[in-house]
A protein has these predicted regions:
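Glycine-rich phosphate-binding loop and adjoining helix at the ATP-binding site
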Residues: 127-170, 176-234
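Short beta-strand(s) of the beta-wing in winged-helix/HTH DNA-binding folds
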Residues: 50, 79-80, 179
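Extreme N-terminal segment that seeds HTH/winged-HTH DNA-binding domains in transcriptional regulators
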Residues: 1-57
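Beta-hairpin "wing" of winged helix-turn-helix
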Residues: 73-90
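Gly/Thr-rich phosphate-binding beta-strand-loop-beta motif of the actin/hexokinase/Hsp70
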Residues: 93-130, 236-241
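Basic amphipathic alpha-helical segments that dock to polyanions
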Residues: 54, 65, 69-78
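Short glycine-rich, Thr/Ser-proximal phosphate-binding strand/loop in the N-terminal lobe
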Residues: 19, 25-26, 111-143, 185
């Protein structure tokens, strides 16, 4: 989970979160994303960023950046701040953009044989709250797993003071063979059932969009977003359990 990774990174992890989250290097699929998304993720990855730097980084016109960022500001996703990275200057303070962190919230969960863990994060990747529930057994039926996930979500919302309508989406990881594109758990050491469309069942239970994947795949993404993988082209994550 992202929370475990950030704690393991210690002060360096805190520094990374405060200076943005997300990959710092361009990914192969970047050019296929909508330009509005590229602009937003460029700002989020850098923590804060002047419009001219966004235009230069994405190789687009300043006018296009102004149009896109104005829309993102109107939607409550970005906000203007004084550009603290450029130091003092005469006249009007330089302006940068940063993510409006409280505009959206997401939940990440890890399901395991001993306990299930959940974290609530804002749009800037800051952890707002954490919650845990003990797993009733080493391997569970799908029905029991859905019940425990629902209980975990209730506990997280209670600790954070948020309600379900504040949450935009949920990402869930668990060990085993997971078809992330279809949301199907083919086999998992924490579940009795096989070939279960767990993503759709969880989405129906929670009433929210759900993304489901193998927990090590998600740990690798956490390293890409928060850890040493942010600024390098290739890396590997090895887990020993």
């Amino acid at each position: 989970m992202a929370s475990e990774l950030i704690r393991d990174l210690g002060s360096e992890g805190s520094k990374l979160v405060s200076s943005g989250c997300g990959p710092l290097l361009a990914l192969p699929q970047d050019d296929t994303r909508p330009l509005r998304q590229q602009v937003f993720e460029q700002v989020r990855a850098n923590g804060q960023m002047p419009r001219m730097d966004v235009a230069r980084k994405l190789n687009i016109s300043p006018g296009s950046v102004t149009t896109i960022t104005s829309d993102l500001i109107a939607r409550g996703l970005l906000q203007e701040v004084e550009d603290s990275q450029r130091g003092p200057s005469r006249g009007r303070p330089p302006i940068a953009l940063r993510v409006a962190p409280q505009s959206r919230f997401v939940v990440g969960m890890k399901l395991s044989d001993e306990r299930h863990t959940a974290v609530l994060l804002d749009l800037a990747g800051t952890i707002i709250a954490e919650a845990h529930v003990a797993s009733a057994s080493l391997r569970q039926s799908t029905e029991d797993m859905l019940t425990e996930v629902s209980s975990l979500m209730d506990r997280l919302l209670q600790k954070s003071g948020r309600v379900m309508s504040d949450i935009s989406a949920v990402g869930i990881g668990l060990p085993g063979l997971v078809d992330a594109s279809l949301g199907i758990v083919k086999w998992s050491p924490v579940m009795l059932d096989t070939d279960m469309p767990l993503r759709d069942l969880l989405s129906k239970t929670l009433g929210l969009p759900v993304s489901l994947d193998n927990d090590t795949n998600l740990l690798t993404l956490a390293e890409l977003w928060f850890g040493a993988g942010r600024g390098i082209s290739n890396f590997a994550v090895v887990t020993i359990e």
